[in-house]
Amino acid sequence: MGDNQILVPLKIDLHISSDALDSYLLDLIHAAEEYITTEGITLDPNNFGDRLLVEMYAAHLYRSRRDTGDKSKMPRMLRWALNNRLFSQKISEG
């Protein structure tokens, strides 16, 4: 996927203006892509929704790295987005 197309909105979402964490954030983006594909979702790098899904997942990984308990759980919005994306893919595959 276009890493910069995901990195810029991720940094905005996380309120990060410095480039100091770019390498770490790119690692989170790649991890998010891998985690999403293990759920059976085929990501399309040209699909804005898929890029946003990766960004949301990477933001969750960043935020949950220091949280414990309920705060480290995946947000419902993200779980629903993943489920909706997978169901949409399965329907289009027939």
Q: What would you call each of these model-derived segments?
A:
Residues M1-L53, R85-G94:
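Conserved short "hinge" loops at termini or chain/domain junctions
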Residues I41-T42, D67-G69:
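Short, structured secondary-structure boundary patches
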Residues N46-N47, A58-D67:
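Mid-chain, well-packed structural core segment of small domains
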Residues L53, Y57, M77:
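Broad gene-expression machinery/nucleic-acid interaction feature
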Residues T68-G94:
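Protruding loop/beta-arch "assembly-hinge" segments enriched in small, turn-prone residues
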